Amino acid sequence: MIVPLALLSRGVVSAPAALAVLFGLTAADIARAASPEPVKSTSAVSTAAPSAAATSEQRYKARLDELIAPVLGLTPDPVDVQRLLDAIRLTGTKDQNGARALRAQITDPAARKLADWLAYRAGVGEAQDITRFVEANPAWPERNLMHRRAEDQLLATGGSTQRIKAFFNGAEPRSGAGYAALASAFLADGNQAEAKRLAGEAWRSHELPATFEKGFLERFGSFLSTVDHKRRFDRLLVDVSRSASDRTQRATTAARVVPLLSESDRKTAEARLAIYLRAKNAAALLAKVPAPADGKTDWGLAFQRAQHMRRTNQDEAAWKLLSTAPRDAALLVNPDEWWEERRSATYDALRLGKNEAAYALVADGTGLSVNPAKDQAFMAGWIALRLLKNPHAALPHLEASRTSADGPLSKARGEYWTGRALDALERNVEAKKRYDDAAKIVDSFHGQLARQKLSGGRSLDLRIGPPAMPTAEQVRRFVELDSVRAAVIATKAGLDRNIRVALFAHLRGHLETEADVAMLAHLAAALGDVQTSLRVGKTGIARGMNLIAYAYPVHPFPAYTPLRDPPEKAMLLAIARQETEFNHTIVSSAGARGLLQVMPITAQHICRDYKIKCDLPRLLTDNSYNATISSAYIGDRMAELRGSYVLGLVAYNAGPGRARQWIRELGDPREANVDPIDWIERIPIEETREYVKKVLSNVQIYRARLDEPNALRLEDDLMRRSDRR
């Protein structure tokens, strides 16, 4: 039987739209070179002779230049390049036969596969062809996306019920489109029970484009109950999105569900939408919500009530509601979003000195997924240990944060704080073991704290050698890998940088050995993409590899002319790494520009204060100029804050006003009676809290990269004050 799916396929993204969204492959983009234009360096600073460690790294990188030369020096056939560009152009049109013919004419296998991958990633091609490509090419990226694209195509093209069922081969679909396609097949074969199950799952749990909803409801609406509609509405609004555009998009989708709800739920839904969108009439609409006829709590409504209470400073009412909410996912719809709301309320409680209430909000982590669970366990343990002075209560939480850690940063944090709890219980041998394990993670804030804890607070040398040297066989496999070759071809053909970024992003997790990943990082740097090289290095470190040489590059930082006594170079490198990963072309959503993310108004103030010409376009094109402006700003803020690195970094990330506000609310981390480690953990804005820790950790590694003796002096940095240095 043939299933006519045209009615349902109106929401499937077209090939031109997909290409535009995914890679921005306009004609101008295709012609544009992938690497940024070189930037100017305006002044020289004398450099000391390289140390033995630096010389060893130089030799290592020179050797890798030789080893990867066969792929780095690859010169694509100009005819192939033109066919590739033309195929990409036609893929964004209705001439798919022409695009396929051009792809088939490309002689270089890697270039031809690149053209196929771009088409399949955009959802152009038969569903089975897309799936076969994914299964046959594990070294190629965006695999989950391509599976979803295949399901989009299956829905768009339809076919026999046998063909559709064979496509899934008994597995559950991955997308709303896939569930709809499979539900259609079962419905056509007369299996209404399975069609109802699949359609219900699509509606309750998956994204469905607006243009797709009408056809879906026409076909499956009779299978959906008001409970299903309520569940879809809850899934959309049990959410803590900080982006106004994200909230608007979700609310627009939710609003289309409102007419499908029961009469009583429609009134509640209007109030919930108003709260979610932070509308002025939210309180008035909330006051009109009728009590539930069955006396049961509507936990979707309760979530919006908690949001409204917190935003209108009804703190204790919000804490009570959030603390007493069940942990059953069936009731809460999304426990992780409830956790985010609980965490926000917890920082409000800490700010107000209500430590018991804060602990009650975070004490139970039932039902959370891995990331929220490890953060919940840490917060509960830290509050119990440091604020409630109850190490017995703290220890099981901190042990849970240690054992649930899924990456090096959370691992180091869990080990370090478990050690602190064991110390407080005078279980010193066990505490040392925890510090030892944390200290192995050398490029983490808590790992560095653990190292200094073990040394009695003394400053320490950090010696870091280059990665493992690849064997001849590893080199052969690397330079012949088609996705590696495709990245070079994409770069030299002038394709959009995001194509290369996607290839490297997948390969950095796919390649197996330290030497493999080092070659990948080296290749990215050799192609002029320091940011991608750095990200490859970060992933390598997270996988337990020594990729410090690439994850913490030194050479991209420019020589510059300081306007005042500058911050130490390690600090500037640390900030640049955190702000832009040395990609000087970045402009933030707030308008910050260039290497160190300078706001135009900041540049104008610095130019006025130091009586120099202000040239805002140079913030993006001249790294030396950007460093001159930003170093003066950083130096000025730190001087105002009496040399405090902690407060200086808060001011740079969140603004000087926030630094002064948090001194008033949380105490002064420069004073002896305030523990700066605890002070950082009480910063209520997650981005700033993590920024301070990461930049301070970066500083320690960069001192080592700059061959400074006693590079690890984090404890001194935490307590730094100009009047007591």
Give the location of each predicted region:
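Solenoid-like repeat scaffolds
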Residues: 69-77, 100-110, 120-124, 132-142, ...
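Catalytic glycan-binding domains that act on GlcNAc-containing polysaccharides
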Residues: 117-119, 131, 136, 314-317, ...
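Alpha-helical adaptor scaffolds
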Residues: 119-121, 135, 147-155, 340-354, ...
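TPR repeat positional signature
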Residues: 83, 111, 116, 147-150, ...
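Residue-level recognition of tetratricopeptide repeat
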Residues: 88, 152, 184, 234, ...
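Compositionally biased, proline/threonine/alanine/serine-rich low-complexity intrinsically disordered stretches
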Residues: 30-80, 724
